Amino acid sequence: MAFPEPKPRGPELPQKRVKTLDCGQGAVRAVRFNVDGNYCLTCGSDKTLKLWNPLRGTLLRTYSGHGYEVLDAAGSFDNSSLCSGGGDKAVVLWDVASGQVVRKFRGHAGKVNTVQFNEEATVILSGSIDSSIRCWDCRSRRPEPVQTLDEARDGISSVKVSDHEVLAGYTGHKNQEYKLDCCLSERDTHVVSCSEDGKVYFWDLVEGALALALPVGPGVVQSLAYHPTEPCLLTAMGGGVQCWREEAYEAEGGSS
């Protein structure tokens, strides 16, 4: 008689707060992991972009150059460059090591909500409230975009460089007044979304059922980022960023 195969263990979801960063940049508009998950970027309403080691809570560098609040940022795949966009309608290319502005791209008619590099970090894609996506050549000195996509009928809130498709819609979280993030967990088993009710919602990707409503705090969870390979979640609320891990995780030196 053959025994049945054991049921695969389900993924562990981050439910334990292990670190809180007081970012000191006014309201944190976005938080983003770098490509390997060792560092994160925070975008502030005080016009700054900051680079952190999130598990240690260490501030590594502050980037100043925007004329208004910073709304999104992304790192290149080789960790040498950053790009950011903000309320000043500008897209900024940064050198990570020196903290200097390499290029400023202008052309959007409204605030820039979202930015992404292509895989080679030769092109920046930016999405704006002006309903356009613009592609900027990082290697050329030409000031105008190499391509403009203006078929959208409303403001662009998110741009992703991917070959994936939209699989399903998930309802239940509250989203009326703010541009809120959503992403996939590190094993692509759950859709994770911010909410205006102070919680982060985890939805089973296949079933579409709510797996977890994680209470973060009394405010709006405006942004989140999921570690690329580990059950580690960053959330942004007010002027701080919270780092969450699975229940079994033991932080070095304890939680703070």
State where each predicted segment sits.
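Terminal intrinsically disordered, low-complexity extensions flanking WD-repeat/beta-propeller proteins
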Residues: 3-9, 168-180, 187-189, 198, ...
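Short C-terminal beta-strands that terminate individual repeats in beta-propeller domains
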Residues: 9-11, 17-23, 59-65, 101-107, ...
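Canonical WD40 repeat/beta-propeller blade segments in eukaryotic WD-repeat proteins
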Residues: 26-32, 68-75, 110-117, 154-161, ...
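WD40-repeat beta-propellers
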Residues: 31, 49-52, 91-95, 115, ...
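Residue-level detector of Asp-centered blade-edge/turn motifs that repeat once per structural unit
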Residues: 35-36, 77-78, 119-120, 162-163, ...
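Conserved strand-to-loop turn within each blade of WD40 beta-propeller repeats
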Residues: 42-46, 84-88, 127-130, 194-197, ...
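A conserved positional marker within WD40/Gbeta-like beta-propeller blades
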Residues: 48, 67, 81, 90, ...
